[in-house]
């Protein structure tokens, strides 16, 4: 063998060894992702996270968190034990503003099929949920509420009502109840929204603080109509309670992923997130997580779904047209003040 050929062979051998070592390192990496726990995290793991981890060649470890405050503690420690966090998009946007997250690499993560409100410099939405109007059919037999205007019409639709202790989505539905069209919601008229909430407050029997509580209120007939997550009311209906809901004037919110500042697995985390938001993996949501939806609209071109599946998905073309998306960037800039005013209103 000539020296030239020997040199080439040695180079090829070295390159192959380097590639194998790189693959082994990637396969050996463990990403820690922290979510909300419960059935939601279980469903996200099976539907999105594990397939994306397999595609990225990483091992996934899971933790739970209780919001942005726990992320701050992680980052401020200087050595976060979490790599990725799953939050609501409003908190992702706030966390990005506070410098809690690494910038996302949009050369690796593709946003084709994404609404521009569904991602930012430091976060990207990975699933959607809906806040919808639900009611008991044994209470409203002949005529039931169909809009947030009806929710505010206590004379035409008397009954016990419930809203959330969190202002996100509640501020929006108050404006819809005031007659503001869904395409004119932002920037939110917070004065009008708070006025409408003050107006309905005497008829609010319960301010719920968790998804489990909201479902139980409706199931046990403690309230007659309410604002509730679509996935939660679906479980109540599945259990046989006389309940219905509508996607009309629903508020579409996002669950998002972000990489914690100081993570030692940033490159692997970028690759993992790229997999989560890919059309192929997003197309698993309508079948596996009914009443949620993909954030990548290309999922509906990749997947083949039955009419029954599309009827349940909040992001099917028919259902998404009935709703409006939450503006995470508006909440990023106004969250603190609105939360304070809202808490004061519902507590007094």
Feature map (PLM): residue ranges:
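Early extracytoplasmic/lumenal segment of secretory-pathway proteins
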Residues: 27-94
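Extracytoplasmic ligand-binding site segments that recognize negatively charged/polar headgroups
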Residues: 36-45, 80-82, 86-219
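A ligand-binding cleft/hinge motif common to bilobed small-molecule-binding domains
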Residues: 90-96, 219, 224-242
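Ligand-binding "clamshell"
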Residues: 95-103, 115-121, 235-247, 308-311
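Periplasmic-binding protein-like
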Residues: 129-131, 191-200, 237-263, 304-308
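A bilobed periplasmic-binding-protein/Venus flytrap-type ligand-binding module shared by bacterial periplasmic
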Residues: 132-139, 175-180, 254-266, 273, ...
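Mature extracytoplasmic/periplasmic domains
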Residues: 260-320
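Conserved C-terminal helix/tail region of periplasmic/extracytoplasmic solute-binding proteins
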Residues: 318-348
């Amino acid at each position: 063998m000539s020296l030239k050929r020997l040199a080439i062979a040695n180079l090829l051998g070295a390159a192959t060894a380097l590639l194998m070592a790189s693959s082994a390192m990637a396969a050996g990496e463990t990403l820690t992702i922290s979510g909300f726990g419960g059935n939601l995290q279980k469903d996200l793991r099976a539907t999105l996270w594990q397939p994306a981890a397999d595609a990225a060649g990483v091992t996934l470890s899971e933790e739970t968190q209780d919001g942005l405050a726990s992320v701050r503690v992680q980052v401020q420690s200087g050595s976060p034990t979490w790599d990725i966090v799953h939050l609501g998009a409003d908190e992702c946007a706030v966390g990005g503003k506070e410098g809690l997250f690494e910038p996302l690499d949009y050369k690796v993560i593709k946003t084709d099929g994404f609404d521009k409100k569904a991602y930012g410099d430091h976060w990207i939405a990975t699933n959607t949920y809906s806040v919808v109007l639900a009611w008991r059919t044994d209470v409203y037999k002949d005529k039931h509420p169909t809009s947030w205007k009806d929710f505010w019409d206590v004379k035409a639709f008397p009954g016990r009502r419930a809203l959330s202790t969190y202002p996100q989505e509640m501020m929006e539905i108050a404006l819809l109840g005031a007659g503001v069209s869904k395409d004119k919601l932002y920037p939110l008229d917070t004065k009008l929204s708070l006025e409408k909430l003050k107006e309905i407050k005497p008829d609010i029997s319960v301010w719920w603080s968790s998804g489990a509580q909201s479902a139980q209120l409706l199931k046990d007939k403690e309230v007659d109509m309410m604002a509730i997550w679509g996935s939660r009311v679906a479980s109540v209906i599945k259990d046989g309670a006389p309940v219905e809901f509508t996607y009309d004037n629903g508020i579409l919110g996002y669950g998002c992923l972000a990489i914690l500042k100081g993570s030692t697995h940033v490159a692997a985390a970028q690759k993992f997130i790229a997999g989560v938001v890919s059309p192929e993996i997003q197309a698993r949501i309508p079948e596996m997580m009914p009443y949620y939806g993909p954030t990548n609209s290309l999922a509906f071109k990749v997947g083949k779904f039955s009419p029954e599946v599309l009827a349940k998905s909040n992001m099917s073309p028919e259902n998404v047209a009935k709703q409006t998306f939450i503006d995470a960037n508006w909440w990023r800039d106004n969250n603190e003040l609105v939360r304070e005013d809202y808490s004061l209103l519902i507590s007094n």
